[in-house]
Amino acid sequence: MECKVHYFYVLLCKDSTFYGGYTTDLARRLNEHNQGIGAKYTKLAKRRPLQMIHAESFATRSEAQKAEYAFKQLTRRQKETYLRTHPSVTLPNGQ
C-alpha cells in the first residue's frame, strides 16, 4: 500500500484574498488553479495568477481536510497570524 502525503495549502490570489485547499500533489494543484480548472473560487480571472504561500503535510486525508476547514473559519486577521506562526513545507514555486 502506497503511503501518500496529504497537504493543506494556502494560495494568495491576485486580488489579495486567501484560498485554502487540500491535495496530495502541490505542484499539480497549483498548476490546475492557475489554468482555471481548480476550485470555483479560483476560476475567476481577477483572482489569477495564484501563488502558493503555505503548505502543511499530514499523514491522513482527514487531518489535512480538518486543517483546511479550520483555516476557512478564520477571519482575515486570524489567517494572517496563522500563516506567520505555522511552519510550511517547501513549496512548488520555491518559497
Report residues per predicted region.
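GIY-YIG nuclease catalytic motif and its immediate N-terminal context
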Residues: 1-38, 48-58, 62-72, 76-77, ...
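A short linear hydrophobic-aromatic micro-motif
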Residues: 40-43
